[in-house]
């Protein structure tokens, strides 16, 4: 597009910031903490915790369940977590591909266990596979987590 539309090169500038587990941003209003999750073969992969004015949110990122995620989500106000239904992968992929996908994502049942073990106040499910099974996700999570669960959608506010 730059050749035909003559956009300035500055708009395409990418500045890479390498980070490690720990505080990645802090000011008088918010602290953002990155923590390692397991999304192998992607290494490193991070989840993030946001603490502001006595409230907290954790975003899991793509991950399988890990103790490190549970540790960083302990007692948070909101946990935003990906979830999948195992039978979906079984129905649309080869057994090998399905096994790989299940290895580095978190099933709805596992998300319920993570939320329970972390003692989160509100669980928001996101990055859902498949996207059209809201009640099934709620039922699976609810076997383990008795707190409030919301199936997320774009532009939701809390």
Describe the predicted segments one by one.
Residues 46-47, 53-58, 64-156:
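Cap/insert and terminal regions of metallo-dependent hydrolase folds
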Residues 1-58, 138-158:
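Binuclear metal-dependent hydrolase catalytic cores
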């Amino acid at each position: 597009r730059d050749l035909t539309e003559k956009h300035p090169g500055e708009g395409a500038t990418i500045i890479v910031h390498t980070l490690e587990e720990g505080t990645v941003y802090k000011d008088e209003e918010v602290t953002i903490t990155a923590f390692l999750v397991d999304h192998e073969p992607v290494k490193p992969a991070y989840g993030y915790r946001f603490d502001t004015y006595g409230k907290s949110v954790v975003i899991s990122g793509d991950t399988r369940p890990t103790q490190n995620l549970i540790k960083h989500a302990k007692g948070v106000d909101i946990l935003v977590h990906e979830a999948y239904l195992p039978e979906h992968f079984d129905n649309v992929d080869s057994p090998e591909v399905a096994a790989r996908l299940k290895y580095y994502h978190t099933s709805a049942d596992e998300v319920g266990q993570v939320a329970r073990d972390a003692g989160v106040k509100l669980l928001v499910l996101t990055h859902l596979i498949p996207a059209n099974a809201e009640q099934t996700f709620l039922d699976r999570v609810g076997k383990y987590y008795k707190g409030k669960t919301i199936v997320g959608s774009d532009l939701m506010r809390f």
